[in-house]
Amino acid sequence: MTEQNHILDAVYGVILARKATQTENSYTASLMRKGLDSVLKKVGEEATELVIAGKGGVADEVVYEAADLFFHTLLLLSYQDIPLERVYTELRRRFGISGIDEKNSRTT
């Protein structure tokens, strides 16, 4: 893996640092101070913006909105004290399994 492949880890590390220091001029810290509902609202907004960009079909807009959604998803993980490695573990677990088989294996 190249250093570029670790960008999610790097961004997550910055988010964790901003959470810990609660710097006044930090967007991340500011959003976290507003609470879970504000964090969830932002994730929802970014997901919607990605869907709209996808419908528009302009690759640069899709990439931009996907990056926003990734960032805010990482922020939510941090807010809830969920290590990024847990997402990696889940993705590795699913890798190579058909989506239908994976869904059927879940407990309800």
Swiss-Prot record:
Keyword annotations from UniProtKB, A to Z: Amino-acid biosynthesis, ATP-binding, Cytoplasm, Histidine biosynthesis, Hydrolase, Nucleotide-binding
Biological process annotations from GO: L-histidine biosynthetic process
Secretion signal, residue range per the UniProt entry: none
One Pfam family recorded for the sequence: PRA-PH
Entry superkingdom: Bacteria
CDD domains xref list: NTP-PPase_HisIE_like
Pathway: Amino-acid biosynthesis; L-histidine biosynthesis; L-histidine from 5-phospho-alpha-D-ribose 1-diphosphate: step 2/9
Enzyme Commission number(s) from the entry: 3.6.1.31
Cellular component, GO, one term: cytoplasm
Enzymatic reactions: 1-(5-phospho-beta-D-ribosyl)-ATP + H2O = 1-(5-phospho-beta-D-ribosyl)-5'-AMP + diphosphate + H(+)
GO MF terms held by the record: ATP binding; phosphoribosyl-ATP diphosphatase activity
Disulfide linkage: none
Compartments, record wording: Cytoplasm
Family of this protein: Belongs to the PRA-PH family.
Official protein name in the record: Phosphoribosyl-ATP pyrophosphatase
Organism name: Pelobacter propionicus (strain DSM 2379 / NBRC 103807 / OttBd1)
